[in-house]
Design a protein with these regions (language model features):
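FIC/Doc superfamily catalytic core
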Residues: 1-205
Length: 205
């Protein structure tokens, strides 16, 4: 299953390593990936920061917010920087609820209380969730399945029998279905699917 997709991925991966990763030192590549990934992941959720805006924020912090951008958007990007650095620094650690919740806490610390008063960064939702036209199931039932998803994914990582890209995509799909947090599920799902790739020595996508 997915043999053709894996072949295409491996071809693109080889080209990426030849044209991009081998032409940068470790620190340059890390910052390049962090800026691109943070800009695009937050952009999917409606953040208007461009890649250049995100790079400027990374270099200058809150001392200079690009014209036309909000402080809330800046805190979203800064939170993503922190969560990205925290999670990818845990490469040797297994997938656990503790790691999941702490990453969410770091990501949403300065934005969730403003967007969803009463919601606690790092804690699961206490209400049923919806996103756009999608209505998710009963939240307690879905949240109860999170440990199983983490355990089965960690087991697959340890056994090494599933291609990392397939495993990352599978995790992302199931995690978004469970939608366990009040906000930030998309960003957390993308962070952890890339964490799976990172653990296998693959680049951030």
């Amino acid at each position: 299953m997915f043999e053709e997709e894996i072949k295409i991925y491996e071809t693109v991966l080889a080209e990426y390593r030849q044209k991009i990763s081998q032409r940068m030192n470790g620190d340059e590549l890390k910052e390049y990936n962090e800026i691109l990934f943070s800009a695009h992941s937050c952009g999917i959720e409606g953040n208007s920061f461009s890649v250049d805006d995100t790079r400027e924020l990374k270099e200058k912090g809150l001392g200079l917010i690009p014209q036309g951008k909000t402080l809330y958007e800046a805190f979203e990007i800064l939170g993503h920087f922190k969560a990205y650095e925290f999670l990818l620094g845990k490469k040797e650690e297994p997938l656990t609820e503790e790691l999941l919740k702490e990453t969410h806490r770091i990501l949403m610390e300065h934005t969730l209380p403003y967007k969803c008063p009463g919601a606690v960064p790092g804690e699961y939702t206490d209400t049923d969730m919806c996103a756009g036209d999608t209505i998710f199931g009963e939240h307690e039932t879905l949240i109860a399945r999170v440990p199983q998803l983490l355990d089965s994914t960690q087991q697959a990582i340890s056994e090494g029998r599933v291609h990392p890209m397939v495993l990352a995509a599978r995790f992302h799909g199931f995690f978004e279905y469970l939608h366990p947090f009040r906000d930030g599920n998309g960003r957390i799902g993308r962070l952890f699917s890339n964490f799976i790739l990172h653990k296998a020595g693959h680049p951030i996508v």
